[in-house]
Amino acid sequence: MEVVQQKKGHPKGLYLLFFTEMWERFSYYGMRAILILYLTKKFIEGGLGMDEKYAMLLYGYFTGFVYFTPLIGGWLADRYLGKRLAVMIGGVTMMLGQFTLFGLNSTTGLYIGLLLLIIGNGFFKPNISTLVGGLYKDGDSRRDAAFTIFYMGINLGAMIAPLVIGVVTDNMFATTNEDGSIAYGYRYGFLVSGIGMLLGQVIFNLLGTKYLGDLGTKPVGAVSDTEVAKVQKSINPETGKELDEKDEKQRISVIFILLIFAVFFWAGFEQAGSSLSLYTDKYIDRSIGSFEIPTSWFQSVNPLFIVTLAPLFTLFWASPIGRRLTTPVKMGVGMIILGVGFLFMIGAVAERSANGDVDDVNNKAALMWLIMTYLLHTIGELCISPVGLSVVTKLSPPKLASVLMAVWMLSSFFANIVGGYIASYVETMGAGEVFKYIAGFVSVCGVLLILLNRVILKLMHGVK
């Protein structure tokens, strides 16, 4: 049996990709934090004055296609471009999209800017993730820890962006109109988001050759015939032998099995931006002394927990106990923890019910219920998302690595649709019932995934 030599620490290329992704996520989440406000605010208030229903529909299509285009960008990178060039094209295109939103400040500029962001994300997103996986040999247990570190970069950008962009739009560049209304500096928020993307690209292009070597410089479709047999074959890390086509197909089938479970996880998790956010706005006591915390600020709680907890998870996955946990078990536990998180929201509903009329917006539940929900959801996320990214790079044949990474990211697209339907039942069923059903369903899914552990491992052919 071939044993993969384990090394301590991580290659410096990981930290280059960490900062590149951090600035890209800063750019994206900074723009996303103000997009719906920019669409719906009146022109005199710094917005475009769109109808709210149309704006929500446009927002949904935008975020949906952001998760769809990586399928195309991943295929182009694998077949023609190479991952490094695809990341550069994607980054520059997204930067131009942000600058278009800033420069034109019109409906035409909006559509052009959003289109550039959608296209750019398609090139960037799947390929930078597969570059992380390419830093490690098959069977290297550091890979899960590496994706946890990488995931911390994603959330560091996501945490900082709404705070920085909020100051830019609401304070630094906000002005008062003659009628006393405020004109927000949303276009300057897009400018700062574009500058963030520019910083990420400068770092990536200046240091890429030094810290990544020739990783991702060639598309699989461009390698020589002699190299094709080496590049396109997957290896069983337990035996050191090449996998045949049947075994590779079984590995790919595992990606789709885990994707189904991931859809249900994210459908529950994404309630943070819909049903949980609305419940927080109406029924959670957000006051600390005389200060009331803006509802939007709670979108930074999850990234804050990610940045805080990710180093601990990195150490845990690298520990003897962590190395023994298989991917299905990790992800199953993550789903169960998500379900437990919703129990705290059920507790918030119960507190309000005990205090009086549940429809009275003055009847508030304690803030701690919400914080505990976000904490447990974050722990569940750390068991699902970086582990999922890692296992896709392990299971994918090299010739399909970026495409299958893009397929994995489609789980978020489907989850947002499912999550929207779930959230729509809050008005008729009540928040408590919806939270109860989510908690029960995702927990059952988690238990089922753990029970399927042995079956799935057989299909993974040496990957754990």
Q: What annotation goes with each model-predicted range?
A:
Residues 69-102:
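Conserved MFS/SLC helix-loop-helix module at the cytosolic interface between two early adjacent transmembrane helices
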